[in-house]
């Protein structure tokens, strides 16, 4: 996405999508910055913003005021530190309030990832996710979460439910495989493997 023509092409591609997950594997190149800016300004579908897209936004917070449609952000503590210009220690002192402040300030759903993930909505409602384990603090785990949330966003058409259910399902998938991997052996693909078990459990329960 390097010029007006490619930006227009991206806008056309967005027209067939029901939701967009942007950030994982993106980098902070000039092309990536233009892509993030184009998506935020033009997308007329819900967005899930993660990883490098958050890092790009942290250098220009005005971008987060550009969105037309519902947005879910999924920062870990380091990304939230850059977004809020606060130390990780300060965030951890009152993580629930920080998540709520960010959600309200930018009119987004904030999924702030920590040992207990906080989901905060702009209307003040908050959830604390109790599924998951320390083995999930592994490279790519957050990418899996953003993908789950994006998929649920399309199915449920509800940003709050997509964020809260997504965090719970992601954690539950990690719990499902913990006995086989332990806390040190778990990798992101193990969490994906655990999703099969989660969906089977959900279907058996009729939900």
What is the predicted role of each segment?
Residues 1-131, 203-207:
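Glycine-rich phosphate/dinucleotide-binding loop and adjoining beta-alpha-beta core of small-molecule
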Residues 63, 124, 157, 181, ...:
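N-terminal loops that bind phosphate or other acidic moieties
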Residues 82, 138-169:
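Short, small-residue alpha-helix embedded
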Residues 88-94, 156-164, 182-186:
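Short, charged, surface-exposed loops that flank catalytic or proteolytic processing sites
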Residues 97-100, 127, 146-147, 160, ...:
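Feature representing long, continuous alpha-helical segments
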Residues 128-140:
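Short pre-catalytic strand/loop immediately N-terminal to key active-site residues, enriched for Gly-Thr
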Residues 172-207:
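Charged C-terminal helix
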């Amino acid at each position: 996405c390097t010029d007006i023509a490619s930006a227009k092409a991206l806008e056309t591609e967005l027209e067939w999508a029901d939701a967009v997950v942007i950030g994982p594997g993106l980098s902070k190149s000039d092309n990536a910055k233009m892509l993030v800016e184009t998506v935020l300004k033009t997308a007329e579908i819900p967005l899930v913003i993660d990883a490098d897209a958050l890092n790009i936004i942290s250098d220009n917070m005005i971008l987060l005021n550009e969105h037309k449609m519902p947005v879910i952000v999924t920062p870990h503590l380091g990304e939230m530190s850059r977004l809020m210009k606060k130390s990780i220690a300060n965030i951890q002192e009152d993580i629930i309030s920080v998540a709520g402040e960010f959600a309200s300030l930018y009119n987004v759903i904030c999924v702030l990832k920590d040992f207990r993930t906080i989901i905060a909505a702009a209307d003040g409602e908050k959830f604390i996710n109790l599924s998951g384990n320390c083995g999930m603090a592994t490279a790519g785990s957050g990418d899996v979460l953003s993908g789950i949330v994006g998929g649920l966003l399309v199915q449920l058409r509800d940003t709050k439910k997509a964020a809260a259910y997504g965090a719970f399902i992601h954690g539950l998938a990690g719990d499902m495989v913990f006995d086989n991997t332990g806390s040190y052996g778990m990798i992101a693909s193990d969490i994906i493997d655990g999703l099969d078990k989660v969906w089977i459990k959900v279907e058996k329960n009729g939900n």
